[in-house]
């Protein structure tokens, strides 16, 4: 089926309407010169009728209709990883990140966008969607909650992570939990004892740093606290690399992967 542009193009190349070949035929009494001049005339008409898209890339761009923005842009978008898929090895493998980020997180984004349509939370911030849908819309909450958790999870890790904790954050942890060693011990224990899928957390509640845990896609947001560090203990997060050794995974995370600068950034936001 031809488009209007194609039809115009065909007419211009054929010559006068309803007489496709007539303009190309010289009459018996025409001179060669007149035949040549008529040929030039037909060629000029044909060239004038060819649409702009047959020309340069600039002509194409000038004649292409502008892309219209979505009337309601998607609220959830899969972020790029802030490092290469193999950058966290040997503590988290390339294969784990390919499955975890590229497949599992993408599924939360896709499902979340579909479930968000037509709800009262459409167009609201991710944090508002998570808090608002909790206890009211389980399907939306599960996917929005996991999207929120993973948006930060990728930033809570970095190559050559772990190491020294920034001073202000270190003091807040010591004031809230007792010591850095105790915080790490309780954090690992929270993850190990989380039955089934879930997360373990450092969070700020009432101005104090606490260690806590949550099931499935829940987070401290739904209990009135603000998360500043979280570790995913769903099996897809560690089973390729650690099999059933969840404690080893949690120890590797807290000692070798944590991006304490980002944790500090979230802490500063939480106490404002």
Predicted feature residues:
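All-alpha RGS (Regulator of G-protein Signaling) helical domain and cognate RGS-like helical scaffolds
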Residues: 103, 114-123, 132-205, 210-211
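Alpha-helical scaffold segments that form or flank carboxylate-/histidine-based iron centers
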Residues: 90-104, 126-148, 216-219, 223-231
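N-terminal secretory signal peptides
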Residues: 1-31
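C-terminal segment of N-terminal export signals and the immediately downstream linker at the start
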Residues: 51-88
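Short alpha-helical hairpin
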Residues: 17-19, 73-90, 120-127
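Early transmembrane hairpin module of multi-pass membrane proteins
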Residues: 87, 93-122
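N-terminal export signals
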Residues: 18-21, 28-29, 35-56
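An amphipathic alpha-helical core segment
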Residues: 189-245, 250-261
């Amino acid at each position: 089926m031809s488009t209007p542009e194609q039809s115009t193009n065909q007419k211009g190349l054929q010559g006068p309407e309803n007489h496709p070949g007539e303009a190309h035929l010289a009459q018996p009494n025409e001179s060669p010169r007149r035949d040549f001049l008529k040929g030039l005339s037909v060629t000029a008409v044909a060239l004038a009728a060819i649409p702009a898209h047959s020309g340069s890339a600039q002509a194409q761009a000038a004649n292409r209709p502008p892309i219209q923005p979505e009337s309601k842009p998607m609220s959830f978008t899969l972020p790029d990883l802030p490092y290469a898929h193999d950058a966290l090895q040997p503590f988290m493998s390339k294969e784990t990140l390919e499955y975890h980020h590229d497949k599992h997180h993408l599924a939360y984004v896709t499902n979340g966008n579909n479930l968000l349509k037509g709800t009262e939370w459409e167009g609201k911030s991710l944090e508002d969607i998570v808090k608002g849908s909790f206890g009211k819309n389980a399907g939306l909450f599960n996917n929005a909650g996991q999207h929120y958790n993973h948006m930060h999870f990728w930033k809570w890790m970095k190559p050559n992570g772990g190491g020294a904790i920034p001073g202000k954050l270190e003091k807040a942890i010591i004031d809230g939990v007792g010591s850095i060693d105790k915080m790490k011990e309780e954090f690992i224990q929270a993850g190990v004892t989380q039955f089934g899928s879930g997360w373990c957390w450092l969070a700020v509640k009432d101005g104090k740093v606490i260690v806590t845990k949550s099931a499935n896609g829940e987070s401290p947001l739904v209990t009135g606290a603000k998360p500043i560090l979280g570790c995913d203990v769903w099996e897809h997060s560690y089973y390729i690399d650690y099999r059933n050794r969840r404690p080893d995974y949690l120890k590797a995370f807290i000692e070798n992967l944590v991006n304490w600068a980002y944790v500090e950034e979230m802490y500063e936001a939480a106490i404002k």
